């Protein structure tokens, strides 16, 4: 069940592919500047959390509306001759990352962009959110002990069998100094 939960979030948060029967971020990015796009409960709750909780908590550092800039970097990486994006292109894209241009209508459960050049990219928060929601769903289904490690996002449920706490090691990215 956890695999299915994670797969569902992967499909919802995918900005590169459409999936039959799923309105995901690919669809939102393609259509939300033209008209409001109705999305699932799961995707709407996530977008609302991103805008109202994650964005202010990180002083804007987790801006899911930065897709226009992140697309430039993605395209540069995928190019036959990878190179950093042009500074003028980055400056132009930065004009289209205002989170306030992301309009979420709670009553209709729709997503709309007031800036036609806006695009969403949830890479900064999507995987962690998916892991947390998957862990909560597993607990609701009765799982009492697990250690999830999904691409570096670690989430413990309960304790190890036998009652000892879970431990997770984190490598110091600056070398051998344990600080």
Residue ranges and their predicted role:
Residues 1-179:
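Mature catalytic core of soluble alpha/beta enzymes
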